[in-house]
């Protein structure tokens, strides 16, 4: 979602917001690289687990990132979301009704920006999603601004999910021994 934010800002000429978004995306990539060894392509998940145990600093750094990101997200809204030019360009543009979203199969943030409650994590929870509390972000306007806001609010929901899980990462084997 930080990449989405950054690229949208760049496309709209809001270069300060673009640089802020990429700066903060780098913080996320630094944490991932420390554990997975890759910045953009992690190749970390495997059949039976993951390639390696998490880095000893992982939990600490994730908590620091969450603490850092909350006020930064408010700053994003101050410098971009509230910008009259951004609002004029995004509001009322590219409207997708709920009916069309369902008909076209536009799931994810696009569907939810049109008022379609289609978050698979809520409808058919998998992994740990059934054990965490989070809000399915919905807007009804169906325009570009609603799609933007869904993604921005989903960043906050992602932080809530991570906060609920970060201290509960199980210890022990990180990859099951399996026969080929």
Question: Can you say where each PLM-predicted feature lies in the sequence?
Answer:
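Active-site bordering "gate/hinge" segments
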Residues: 1-180
């Amino acid at each position: 979602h930080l990449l989405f934010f950054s690229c949208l800002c760049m496309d709209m000429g809001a270069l300060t917001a673009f640089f802020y978004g990429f700066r903060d995306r780098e913080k996320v990539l630094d944490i991932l690289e420390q554990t997975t060894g890759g910045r953009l392509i992690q190749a970390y998940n495997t059949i039976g687990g993951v390639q390696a145990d998490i880095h000893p600093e992982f939990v600490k750094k994730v908590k620091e990132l969450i603490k850092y990101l909350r006020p930064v997200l408010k700053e994003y809204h101050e410098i971009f979301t509230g910008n009259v030019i951004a609002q004029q360009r995004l509001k009322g543009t590219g409207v997708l009704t709920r009916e069309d979203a369902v008909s076209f199969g536009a799931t994810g943030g696009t569907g939810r920006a049109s008022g379609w409650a289609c978050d698979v994590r809520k409808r058919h929870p998998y992994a740990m999603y059934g054990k965490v509390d989070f809000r399915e972000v919905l807007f009804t306007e169906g325009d570009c601004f609603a799609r933007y806001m869904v993604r921005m609010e989903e960043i906050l929901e992602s932080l809530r999910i991570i906060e609920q899980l970060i201290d509960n990462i199980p210890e022990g084997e990180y990859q099951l021994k399996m026969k080929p």
